[in-house]
């Protein structure tokens, strides 16, 4: 019985080997490169050597034969992680990556894809190399590091595959297209004269728009935005104004990219579920003006600015926190997140909070390069675990005004004489104003009428009660 079982196992394995060999013959029976190759296509003869998708399998043994089973759960998880990484990679490449061509001996084209970054960002490039199984070595100086690949077969089987499915969304889209087409023609044996070679090399990155080719902004996604942020984003703090800011910059020739980011965020990112109702209503009321484009500076650079604290805290921060980061920019984000927490809780009005903000300011953005990051978790936790000063149900600006006027009145125990608080007939706070004038403008009446209804306590406009204090 055992003998026949072993024979069955042997015959099964031989069948699988023969079948696999037949598949490999079909797999490699390709002579031309496909210009419209889909991601994970088996049409490329070179993709067999690359592990673009991590596949999870395990084997089990029963009484008669070996059964090969696919671990679908882990496989799906790995596929999703890799998909998200590819989207991130494209966004990061749109900001910091390069597609370019060099001439060898003035007659041979060499194709390159890669990154040149600060030496402190080596860990990021190591992640990219490992995730792609990129057969490349680092080139390092005391200040910079490069990760570049020039193996045409590998580039076609991997980079072209990824960027065809998840396209660039800046003007680099045109550079990639010209780079890819030149590579495909080169792989298919097309010959060029010296003039054509120079023309191909010099026009890859000339920022020329191709009228018959539209950048597919509808392909924008969360991870592309994150990758682009890690390349081109900046998390700012303003100690003098006690606010945080966030921006993404780009040359004016890619202004449509910034407009597309703005449109995508406003249409797809929403306040988190536990956003206090008053704040949520105000966010939705001012939604379209929450993100602004600046005018070009003297160098032609435009910024997409996110400056409203409540919008940053209840919309931008939670979304970015939910995504997987790959670069050192995550340190900036975490420090910025801590700063946001300090401000939103009003802890910048304490000595410990103020000191921590100064420490963070010396370690964020460009200051983190060549710096010894020495802010311990205990210091941060010690501040964030303090009792909250601000009322979490109120917008940040209102809390700031309350604190400022309380300080002026030397009274830190209750809120007095601050702005206008608007309640419905059930004493539910529904909106706030920083003073009589903005309330009067909103309700289209005089500030004296606002003052009168606050003083006499009568119902305003048949449905509101106006107060100049916050009810418990």
Swiss-Prot record:
Keywords assigned by UniProt, alphabetized: Mitochondrion
Give TM segment ranges: none
Q: Which Pfam families match?
A: LAGLIDADG_1, NUMOD1
**Transcription regulation as UniProt keyword:** no
Instruction: Select a single GO molecular function from the record's annotations and give it.
Output: endonuclease activity
Q: Cross-referenced InterPro entries, in alphabetical order?
A: Homing_endonucl, Intron_nuc_1_rpt, LAGLIDADG_dom, LAGLIDADG_Endonuclease, NUMOD1
Single GO cellular component annotation? mitochondrion
SUPFAM superfamilies recorded: Homing endonucleases
Location in or out of the cell = Mitochondrion
The superkingdom listed in its UniProt entry is Eukaryota
Question: What is the designated name of this protein?
Answer: Uncharacterized mitochondrial protein RF1
Name its species. Saccharomyces cerevisiae (strain ATCC 204508 / S288c) (Baker's yeast)
Q: What is the lineage of its organism?
A: Eukaryota, Fungi, Dikarya, Ascomycota, Saccharomycotina
